[in-house]
UniProtKB/Swiss-Prot annotation:
<keyword id="KW-0813">Transport</keyword>
<feature type="transmembrane region" description="Helical">
    <location>
        <begin position="471"/>
        <end position="491"/>
    </location>
</feature>
<feature type="transmembrane region" description="Helical">
    <location>
        <begin position="520"/>
        <end position="540"/>
    </location>
</feature>
<feature type="transmembrane region" description="Helical">
    <location>
        <begin position="344"/>
        <end position="364"/>
    </location>
</feature>
<keyword id="KW-0812">Transmembrane</keyword>
<dbReference type="GO" id="GO:0022857">
    <property type="term" value="F:transmembrane transporter activity"/>
</dbReference>
<keyword id="KW-1133">Transmembrane helix</keyword>
<dbReference type="Pfam" id="PF00854">
    <property type="entry name" value="PTR2"/>
</dbReference>
<feature type="transmembrane region" description="Helical">
    <location>
        <begin position="230"/>
        <end position="250"/>
    </location>
</feature>
<feature type="transmembrane region" description="Helical">
    <location>
        <begin position="429"/>
        <end position="449"/>
    </location>
</feature>
<feature type="transmembrane region" description="Helical">
    <location>
        <begin position="201"/>
        <end position="221"/>
    </location>
</feature>
<feature type="transmembrane region" description="Helical">
    <location>
        <begin position="383"/>
        <end position="403"/>
    </location>
</feature>
<protein>
    <recommendedName>
        <fullName>Protein NRT1/ PTR FAMILY 4.7</fullName>
    </recommendedName>
</protein>
<dbReference type="InterPro" id="IPR000109">
    <property type="entry name" value="POT_fam"/>
</dbReference>
<feature type="transmembrane region" description="Helical">
    <location>
        <begin position="160"/>
        <end position="180"/>
    </location>
</feature>
<dbReference type="GO" id="GO:0016020">
    <property type="term" value="C:membrane"/>
</dbReference>
<feature type="transmembrane region" description="Helical">
    <location>
        <begin position="560"/>
        <end position="580"/>
    </location>
</feature>
Length: 589
């Protein structure tokens, strides 16, 4: 302040009144410009591409619009996905296996396309624009499905219409899944402790919002489809995604948008290509260079090769790009920051691979568990619960657990560990993986109990397979495994999203966050492969395959669940190997 006062006095003393006025105004404008620069978010703009300002853009208010939109978006998606097998088999003339394969392909494609949405948001557009375009595409697909369902035709043209609608929806869902979570997460200031805490809260409540949409989808919308007609169900989904757009736009004035920074895939391939080229060139050169004369010389060369610290082979391999930068062709020259970013991406990939088995468990329980419940007593008092409504149990449990975790468990963890996060992202993911092991063990025990009831009923009725009426065992036994799996999903999905977003370079955060959905897609695909492989192996030498028979009572489902439990345990050991060696790039302590 004293400096500015001295400058103004100097102007008044040595210049004319008119020139004094102009120079003082110029000085004031320079000060205003400096203030604006200091208050602007670096690398962020508002929806009109103007600099985003602190105190005006971002924060929990901006993220709250995203949470409401997620309720509507997931309602629109799951309302169809949860009951689509029944629609294809009863209305469109698909065989049970054909319907299941069609739904698996649709779900897997939708989740995989999240990678495309994340890539476009990082490279060329903002998450704001990707959401709006994706919502329009999903709305168009749902309109096609609504018209197709109203026609009730099984002609080939109707099936073409059906699949056009489904995959338009898949494309739209992929774009939304790839842009909406990072759009909400980027509203928080990661430079402050309060901003990081709010971002953690956001990811937990994102799962809560996702569960709210799922609850409405598997209850209200499924009831409409079963009792009023499928066009009503598709119509509700269409209305939900349409309403989500003005809700999303309502937050435009307070959003801050990350400026796209070019293709992260290009950077990834450029660095890897440069590393391979540098390694090849070094090997060619080493054939000419005289070898070390003494052991000390050799030790010195090894030290130079491992100058990247604790990264071992990865650090040595990618470090060549920096060390040999001047000798590389100009198109392959990379900055140290680019090499560092690629190193981070490679290090998070094993964590991503370790989560696929959990999602495979989710896929199995969403199919076989419903069939288990359909053979059991599904009455609660005078009310009969449809087996397709079983997903209500994990959804409701996740809705209860998410705020409990935020407001009770997390503060206790912070107090006991004296750290900002309380429980690290990798610990959250690991907790989810452990719960998935418990869920599969519980599923195996429940199926064993159910089979004992089947045997008892068969002996009492002198029949070989008791399946004509509900078994005298309540379906609530199956709900136990759903509770464990719902808990696993909450810990792992929220942990994955926050881990990938926080640890990924700022230039590829949307793409990295989309790995959470890609893991889900690979879990669905792997589940189909696993069932086929189990049936093939167990059916050798004229044995009965574990998962084939006239009905579920002839399956060896409990053996399959135990196999899943063992595989999940092995996968957890694989996860521990990588997680224990991972060094966070961000503040986790």
């Amino acid at each position: 302040m004293s400096t500015n006062y001295t400058a103004i006095n100097h102007i008044l003393h040595f210049h004319s009144p008119n020139s004094c006025f102009l120079m003082i105004m110029s000085l004031e404008f320079e000060q205003m410009d400096e203030a604006n620069r200091l208050s602007a978010w670096n690398g962020y703009v508002d929806w009109r591409s103007r600099p985003a300002l602190r105190g005006r853009h971002g924060g929990m208010l901006a993220a709250s619009f995203v949470l409401v939109v997620e309720v509507l978006e997931n309602l629109a998606f799951l309302a169809n996905a949860s009951n689509l097998v029944l629609y294809l088999s009863t209305k469109m003339g698909f065989s049970p296996s054909g319907a299941a394969n069609a739904v698996t392909a649709f779900m897997g494609t939708a989740f995989f396309l999240a990678l495309l949405g994340g890539f476009l948001a990082d490279a060329f557009f903002t998450t704001f624009h990707i959401y709006l375009v994706s919502a329009a595409i999903e709305f168009l697909g749902l309109m096609v499905l609504t018209v197709q369902a109203h026609e009730h035709s099984t002609e080939p043209w109707s099936r073409v219409f059906l699949f056009v609608g489904l995959y338009l929806v898949a494309l739209g869902v992929g774009g939304i899944k790839g842009s909406l979570p990072p759009h909400g997460a980027e509203q928080f200031d990661e430079e402050t402790s309060s901003g990081r805490r709010q971002r953690s809260f956001f990811f937990n409540y994102f799962i809560f919002s996702l569960s709210c949409g799922a609850l409405i989808a598997v209850t209200v919308v499924v009831w409409l489809e079963d009792n009023k007609g499928w066009s009503y169900g598709f119509g509700v989904s269409t209305a939900a995604i349409l309403i989500s757009v003005p809700v999303f736009l309502a937050g435009s004035r307070v959003y801050r948008l990350k400026v796209p920074s070019g293709s992260p895939i290009t950077t990834l391939f450029k660095v890897l290509t440069a590393a391979l080229y540098a390694k090849y060139k070094k090997r060619r050169t080493s054939r000419i260079v005289v070898t070390c004369h003494t052991r000390n010389d050799c030790d010195d060369s090894v030290t130079k090769q491992n100058c990247d610290g604790d990264d071992g082979f990865l650090g040595s391999f990618l470090g060549e790009v920096v060390r040999e930068r001047e000798s590389l062709p100009r198109p392959l020259r990379c900055t140290e920051e680019q090499v560092k970013d690629v190193k981070i991406v490679i290090k998070i990939l094993p964590i991503f691979m370790s989560t696929i088995m959990l999602n495979c468990c989710l896929a199995q329980l969403s199919t076989f568990s419903v069939q288990q419940a359909s053979t059991m007593n599904t009455k609660l008092g005078s009310f009969t619960v449809p087996p397709a409504a079983l997903p209500v149990f994990p959804v409701v449990f996740m809705m209860i657990l998410a705020p409990t975790y935020n407001h009770l468990l997390l503060p206790l963890a912070r107090k006991s560990t004296k750290t900002e996060t309380g429980i690290t992202h990798l610990q959250r993911i690991g907790t989810g993986l452990v719960l998935s092991i418990v869920a599969m063990a519980v599923a195996a025990l429940v199926e064993t109990k159910r089979k004992h009831v089947v045997v008892s009923c068969c002996s009492n009725n002198n029949s070989s397979s008791y399946s004509s009426s509900p078994l005298p065992i309540t379906f609530l036994w199956v709900a136990i495994q759903y509770v464990f799996l719902g808990s696993a999903d909450l810990f792992t999905l929220a942990g994955m999203m926050e881990f990938f977003f926080t640890e990924a370079p700022s230039t590829m955060r949307s793409l990295a966050t989309s790995l959470s959905w890609a893991s889900l897609a690979m879990g669905y695909y792997f589940s189909s492969v696993l069932v086929s492989a189990v049936n093939f192996v167990t059916g050798l030498n004229h044995h009965n395959p574990w998962l084939l028979g006239e009905n579920l009572n002839q399956y060896h489902l409990e053996r399959f669940y135990w196999l899943m439990c063992v595989l999940s345990g092995i996968n957890f050991l694989h996860y521990l190997f990588w997680a224990s060696r991972y060094v966070y790039r961000s503040n986790q302590g």
